[in-house]
């Protein structure tokens, strides 16, 4: 078991935002059998939560630009969603990575630092 310290409300906001983005993209592109996969794993000293869909994926561009405020590739997008998620991750000492899922969809990986517990139960 691994432990991380986080603000549950902010992490919920981040996950909700990412799931909504995936849902919107799958609907806008009329994906026949839409799917969003969520997985969790430990990687080195981080806990990784990965969301992957089977939509068209991110556009061919510098994906880091999508994390900047007001940058959007969608007609009705504000360009704030991914920037907010990125800031939430930064505030938690973690990070967010964008990429391509197997099969070409969008992949987002949220990484939180692992905190270890001492024998007396304190988190360090």
Predicted features along the sequence, with ranges:
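A residue-level detector for a conserved hydrophobic packing site
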Residues: 11-12
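Short conserved segment of the HATPase_c
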Residues: 58-69
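Short alpha-helical Gxxx[C/S/T] motif in the catalytic ATP-binding
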Residues: 81, 85
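Short beta-strand-loop-beta element adjacent to the nucleotide/active-site pocket used for signaling
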Residues: 34-37, 41-49
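Acidic ATP/Mg2+-coordinating residue in the GHKL
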Residues: 53
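Conserved micro-motifs of the catalytic ATP-binding
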Residues: 3-6, 73
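Detector for a conserved hydrophobic position within an alpha-helical segment of the HATPase_c
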Residues: 89-90
């Amino acid at each position: 078991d691994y432990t991380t310290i986080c603000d549950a409300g902010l992490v919920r906001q981040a996950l909700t935002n990412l799931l909504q983005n995936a849902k919107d993209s799958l609907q806008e592109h009329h994906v026949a059998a839409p799917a969003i996969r969520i997985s969790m794993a430990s990687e080195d000293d981080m806990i990784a939560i990965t969301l992957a869909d089977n939509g068209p994926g991110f556009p061919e561009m510098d994906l880091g630009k999508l994390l900047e405020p007001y940058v959007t590739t969608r007609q009705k997008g504000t360009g704030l969603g991914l920037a907010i998620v990125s800031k939430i991750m930064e505030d938690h000492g973690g990070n967010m990575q964008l990429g391509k899922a197997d099969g070409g969809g969008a992949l987002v990986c949220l990484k939180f630092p692992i905190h270890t517990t001492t024998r007396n139960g304190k988190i360090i």
